[in-house]
């Protein structure tokens, strides 16, 4: 029997890359590859890359420098190691990667992962293989499906890609160039994936896409289904207790999505809705095609539909031309909305984007100062949101043993980690927990009732409407 070959994948960036990494593992399993935690011991190392920020892509080249040493060590020991660069850096830079890092054997863009087996063979025969085209075929129809044991090993939460690409062309963003135009998967294929996951123990699904609420997939009735209708359908699949989605664009929030948050108890009341800036002038320069007040109105619609809903967001400071007044408008928006969590970044010019050619730049020192001020406000809001839960009882979906002996960790509806002393038998169950204290970002608490599974109702949530 041929011994299995070892595969190590390191993913950078977004949730889509986590999903893509799992699908690459599934695609390579029939070729005899099994995952290993060590890059040094691997026969194949894949760097699944992100191109959103300059530091992310530079990390890849730093990692390739370390892998060159590991590859040389393997060769001295008589073992061949292949190195592949996948993801958005691969798509954006293509042949430049092998010129800059000759240690790389394969460069493969996000739309071509189903070609990995043949690309590895080609690299073995020809020395290099680069594929970064946008093929017309839907890659999702060709990627291997995970086996039941692989699904169970990955735990009770899973990502499912329903949409890929973006048509918005924000001036700072490379996604339309690296992931292509918006494409939605057919409803039937998504349902098949979800049923397979549910049959093998998955309780929580996060539907993902670069612009997930732009989803309009072909439904079984011959009509185009929006995200809200898809969520409603998936909520009825036995075994699925929680639904989430990410990442959203304010312009694509429609009535069906608002209704889903009003009506579906399985749909968690936590929405990641990036806005990037609170200044209309900067939003226009970013080509966001909405104003700060447009964003506020979207938030109001969600809150009218479900009172306990909470939000996270993304913000960029130091976008070209951002004045102190523009930045103060961002602080005002954050103060007014009140976030459970948010992510702030200094502007990073990406080659090939319109913003990279904008001349009126903000100094690094000013960016640092604004980032610190914004993050201080965000941190204070997150701390207040978390502390408000102390003393209350919340439902927690338990996921795995914690690092501390005897503890099991799960997550609340708002993705806050919660630790309790309990047996592993509660993993996969949703149970009420009294929150006793907060340590940094994690709760400590106690189970309130006997350890019996509680399923969230799929009936409409009572509202004042």
Swiss-Prot record:
Source taxon at top rank: Bacteria
Cofactor(s) the protein needs: [4Fe-4S] cluster
Binding positions for [4Fe-4S] cluster 1 per the UniProt entry: 14, 50, 88
Cross-referenced NCBIfam families: miaB-methiolase (TIGR01574), MiaB/RimO family radical SAM methylthiotransferase (TIGR00089)
Subunit structure: Monomer.
Keywords in alphabetical order: 4Fe-4S, Cytoplasm, Iron, Iron-sulfur, Metal-binding, S-adenosyl-L-methionine, Transferase, tRNA processing
Domain TRAM residues, every copy: 387-449
A Pfam family hit: Radical_SAM
Enzyme Commission numbers on file: 2.8.4.3
Catalytic activity: N(6)-dimethylallyladenosine(37) in tRNA + (sulfur carrier)-SH + AH2 + 2 S-adenosyl-L-methionine = 2-methylsulfanyl-N(6)-dimethylallyladenosine(37) in tRNA + (sulfur carrier)-H + 5'-deoxyadenosine + L-methionine + A + S-adenosyl-L-homocysteine + 2 H(+)
Record-listed [4Fe-4S] cluster 2 binding positions: 166, 170, 173
Species for this entry: Bradyrhizobium diazoefficiens (strain JCM 10833 / BCRC 13528 / IAM 13628 / NBRC 14792 / USDA 110)
HAMAP family: tRNA_metthiotr_MiaB
GO cellular component annotations of the record: cytosol
The protein's name in its UniProt record: tRNA-2-methylthio-N(6)-dimethylallyladenosine synthase
Record domain MTTase N-terminal: where: 5-125
């Amino acid at each position: 029997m041929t011994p299995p070959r070892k595969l190590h994948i390191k993913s950078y960036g977004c949730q889509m890359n986590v999903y893509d990494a799992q699908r690459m593992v599934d695609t390579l399993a029939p070729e005899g590859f099994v995952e290993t935690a060590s890059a040094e011991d691997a026969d194949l190392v894949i760097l699944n890359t992100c191109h959103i920020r300059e530091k992310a892509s530079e990390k890849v080249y730093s990692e390739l420098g370390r892998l060159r040493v590991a590859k040389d060590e393997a060769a001295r020991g008589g073992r061949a190691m292949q190195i592949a660069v996948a993801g958005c850096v691969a798509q954006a830079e293509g042949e430049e990667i092998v010129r800059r890092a000759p240690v790389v054997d394969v460069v493969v863009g996000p739309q071509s992962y189903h070609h990995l087996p043949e690309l590895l063979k080609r690299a073995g025969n020809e020395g290099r293989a680069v594929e970064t085209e946008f093929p017309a075929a839907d890659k999702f129809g060709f990627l291997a499906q995970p086996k039941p044991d692989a699904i169970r090993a990955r735990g009770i939460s899973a990502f499912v890609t329903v949409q890929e690409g973006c048509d918005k062309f924000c001036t700072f963003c490379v996604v339309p160039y690296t992931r292509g135009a918006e494409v939605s998967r057919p409803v039937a294929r998504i349902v098949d994936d979800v049923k397979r996951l549910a049959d093998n123990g998955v309780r929580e699904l996060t539907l993902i896409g670069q612009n997930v609420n732009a989803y309009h997939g072909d439904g079984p009735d011959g009509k185009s289904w929006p995200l809200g209708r898809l969520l409603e359908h998936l909520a009825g699949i036995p075994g699925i207790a929680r639904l989430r989605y990410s990442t959203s664009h304010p312009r694509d929030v429609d009535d069906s999505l608002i209704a889903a948050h009003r009506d579906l108890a399985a749909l968690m009341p936590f929405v990641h809705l990036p806005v990037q800036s609170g200044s209309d002038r900067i939003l226009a320069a970013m080509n966001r095609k909405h104003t700060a007040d447009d964003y506020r109105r979207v938030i109001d619609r969600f809150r009218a539909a479900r009172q306990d809903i909470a939000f996270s967001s993304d913000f960029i400071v130091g976008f070209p031309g951002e004045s102190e007044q523009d930045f103060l408008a961002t602080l005002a928006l954050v103060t007014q909305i009140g976030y459970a969590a948010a992510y702030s970044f200094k502007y990073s010019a990406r080659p090939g984007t319109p913003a990279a050619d904008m001349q009126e730049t903000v100094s690094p020192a000013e960016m640092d100062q604004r980032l610190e001020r914004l993050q201080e406000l965000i941190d204070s809001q997150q701390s207040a949101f978390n502390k408000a839960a102390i003393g209350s009882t919340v439902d927690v979906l338990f996921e795995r043993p914690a690092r501390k002996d005897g503890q099991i960790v799960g997550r609340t509806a708002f993705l806050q980690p919660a630790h309790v002393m309990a047996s592993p038998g509660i993993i996969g169950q949703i149970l009420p927990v009294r929150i006793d204290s907060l340590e940094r970002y994690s709760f400590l608490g106690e189970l309130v009732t006997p350890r019996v599974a509680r399923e969230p109702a799929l009936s409409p949530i009572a509202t004042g409407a």
